[in-house]
């Protein structure tokens, strides 16, 4: 260390305190990184790796980024899971005696981002904690960009509930206890959710309790509802302690903590959120194609974040649901007012994140201008709320603070279009400060004198090319070309010689320069001081502004739901506690939104007694999965307070939705398709209650037919049994044997309507009572484009299996070993002559050809092949072509 240069000694002493972070060390206009940090930065950020003398004749690897563009580089490092410690110069280098003092002012981690450029407008950025305490587990999370802070406690230490909550909020970073890390599935879950984690450091509940009391400046946590929840206190205390260590400041905008219970909301585990595609799609993890994409017509960023919460946490209290629905209905019935409110919301910026920056002391004048524009809209919104009469809107109106005083302050003080920098003036309006006005007047007078100097000096000297200019090095000057140097007055003093001219000053010019530049410096300093005072006043009012912001967010979501109801013909659901779910002409909100044609609606009836377990049979691609998801989404939408895509809907409140939809090998955990499926089924039968809604799309497919059927049968009996679960269930299956369960109380058979005619099989996507007569698997394979050879061979095998099945029924034997084997040539010989040429072509790799689905196309081919085209007259040929075209159009086909 003694061999290091003073600057490198300073660097190393600071780096030793922050070994787990990449240290951005401020040197002038750059952040420099040294040694291993430099190597990491060069690799991850594609920077040039250079070197700097560190003393003792040795060089230290070095890489740097400009301060003005550092955010983009920091964002890339955070995305890759690194922490970044920002080390600033804390004194003016021009005033420093010796080495400039430096210290770390903030540690930026993935879960502690406040910079708008690194955040998505309509998504939260959470830091979470999951801490074990005795037989409980505390769970807490915060978004420091908005100030939202939540906490809860689980009665089971290693419950899957913690993983479901982590999946719901999708945190960027998690603080965990080592006990949780040692659980069997931790590594797999972390990999799936992709979060950075840190270890907890608080051992005593008392210490965590004191951290919270100190932060909230209170004597008790009773007002926050977590006084008697030690595990929750530990989890919340860990977050506050972490923020204290990393952010190096008090965060006034985190001024309350909300204690919640999972039982206050419908439970949606990670599998259900995934299968129902609530906020992102299964394929590609995209926003478009999700329920959120359909429902989110919010105008503000705050509303966008809130509607996502409502989707992920539907209500289970009937009164609360009805309160939301009343509000949405009132907006639906007041179209003009709805549009007026939405127009007013367009002027509202992201108040929550502006307050986060104000709390940090990083808000600039543009942030305060955005706050000003937003607050100036509030009186209009207050008047809008006054015109609404439902309970929720009345409460919102009564508690809505239009912040008139702050609006006046910001409107008087902050210019309409301020610069980004707060140190270079141009922030404060004329008339706000008399002292500032005097300085500006002096500056203006000085500049006017200097501006007139060029004219007066040209007249006085007779030098028409004389110029008055300014640069930062020499200040103001008079420039005269060399051809006119003999005419320079005696009171001019030479300042600088150029190739073609010389620059001079005069005593009067220096005096005015001192006045102007002195005034400029004083103006900039005074404007900054005034700005900081205004920002501090805003900081003192954070609680007030946050309450108003929360009302605006809720209003935005309610207007979004009302707008959706009007545009998409959604209707208000009736909510009950008796368990009846009745949907008339229900539609899938996402499929309908993305589809090109008219969506086929379906009815649904479920109750807790006579029709609680619905077995749905029918072919693949007929709409069974879409129908079941549709029912689940309609229930979820109703309980979040939304109108629903149905002509009528009665929703018996559901405490939890379970889905077991499809399955594939889980490569991250090494589990087979069948194991994944059985884990999901086990989760359902172990956690479902009588008030749950269960969606089962095939059970038992990943094993042998008899094993699968046996499991599906037993699971059906168990779920349907009121003494076990007795939950409302939709079960789609290809095991037609399960339809025999209809003789059990509570079980009903339904199937998808299929129409057969001379043109083939038509899937009508209509759910009707009764069991399916056939599976139509070969027809679906044909629709998918399998070669004709396979289709025809499958039909022959099916015929033989069905024949042997009938024979086994008579003889009591069920074996089907003697299925005939036929060669390709045998098959082709059995095909109708008119199709041989087509089938031969199908064996090529021509991907453009599509398998004809309907029999009408074969007849068209037959007609064309049998026609004596050579001997046809032109008119006969045209008429024949017209007949062919007409026939194809009537069948709705596009034959190529």
Swiss-Prot record:
Residues 805-826 are annotated as: Disordered. InterPro entries: DNA_mismatch_repair_MutS, DNA_mismatch_repair_MutS-lik_N, DNA_mismatch_repair_MutS/MSH, DNA_mismatch_repair_MutS_C, DNA_mismatch_repair_MutS_clamp, DNA_mismatch_repair_MutS_core, DNA_mismatch_repair_MutS_N, DNA_mismatch_repair_MutS_sf. Belongs to the DNA mismatch repair MutS family. Residues 805-825 have a biased composition (Basic and acidic residues). This protein is involved in the repair of mismatches in DNA. It is possible that it carries out the mismatch recognition step. This protein has a weak ATPase activity. GO terms for molecular function: ATP binding; ATP-dependent DNA damage sensor activity; damaged DNA binding; mismatched DNA binding. It comes from Halothermothrix orenii (strain H 168 / OCM 544 / DSM 9562). This is DNA mismatch repair protein MutS. The keyword DNA damage applies. Transmembrane segments: none annotated. CDD domains: ABC_MutS1 (cd03284). Keywords: ATP-binding, DNA damage, DNA repair, DNA-binding, Nucleotide-binding. Gene3D superfamilies: 1.10.1420.10, DNA repair protein MutS, domain I (3.40.1170.10), MutS, connector domain (3.30.420.110), P-loop containing nucleotide triphosphate hydrolases (3.40.50.300). The gene is mutS. One of its GO terms (biological process) is mismatch repair. Signal peptide: none annotated. ATP binds at residues 618-625. The keyword DNA-binding applies. Pfam families: MutS_I, MutS_II, MutS_III, MutS_IV, MutS_V. One of its GO terms (cellular component) is cytosol. It comes from the Bacteria.
